[in-house]
Amino acid sequence: MRSYLTPVAGLTCLFALAATGCSSMSDGTSDAAPKASESSTSYAPYVSATTATGTDSAGSPATYNLAFVISGGSDCTPRWDGMFGMDDAEVKSRIGKLRKSGATVRVSFGGASGKELATTCGNASALADAYGKALDAAGSTQADFDIEGRTLADSASVDLRSRAIARLQKQRPGLEVSFTLPVMPSGLDSHGLALLESANVHDVQVSTVNLMTMNYAESYTGDMGDYALTAAKAAHTQLKKVFGLSNAAAWEGMALTSMIGANDIAGETFTLEDAAQVRSFAEEKRIAWVSMWSTFRDRQCEKGVPSRADAATDCSGVKQKPGAFAREFGG
């Protein structure tokens, strides 16, 4: 998933599931506290670490994925969006406001833009320290690693990251780790599977594998909701094999993240109907959480539905009311 600052662009079991089956800008949307729900599927949108929007609280998120922490250049210093220090007062204030509803905050490292810290830190100890600084700054015990593009294909950084996360979990018992990975309707690719295997080799305790059901390819011109479900089913089979999980546990260790409205690939548009479809499926399968990229885009563009194919960073590109996607995902 893209940075908010990017210009518009054309054999360890799942830790949380070990007991259940492991075999080896305001736009007028008001704040709302998380609502009680019998569903095991929570709503956890991606939000900007630096900029608030009136749609942040729509859908009553249980958790906010705070995006993104990356390197500020070529060193091992973690920065919000690659620009702001961990002690930035405005970011700290923002985190505090997000928590007022009772929601938790998950720190998301990586993303599609900038340099993920595993590509700039020299060793596992330094990398673990960098990750830890970000978690401490946010007061969080939840870490998400959004690994994609060239970074996902970089086996050296994949190995280093796994070793650093394992080290960090030993230092911080109870640290929840999720991996956010690109997926196709056919499932995770070889690089995504290799990352999960690396996590296994280094005894990383993985809570959730979050699938980015978005931006497939120009040949995928069908229904984006259907594609999301197809991708989830394919990845479900893969997760069972990688982690040695039961059917139920593999679903419960999965999350789904959609790019709302116009995607970066021309012809791919994720609609409100698709969001409702994904939410229903997630509840049926007891998937851990659903998410979207992003709250900042959960509004109609000022000029309505643009004719251009590019996805905007600050609106969805489809006809909607502010926060409409969040309300669908929130259930």
Language-model region placement:
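Chitinase-like catalytic core of GlcNAc-active glycosidases
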Residues: 23-211, 215-242, 251-255, 261-275, ...
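Conserved active-site loop/cleft motifs that coordinate metal ions or position small ligands
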Residues: 255-258, 289-294
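Feature marks hydrolase-like catalytic cores characterized by long aromatic- and Gly/Pro-rich stretches
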Residues: 31-33, 283-289, 327-331
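Bacterial N-terminal signal peptides that target proteins for export
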Residues: 1-9
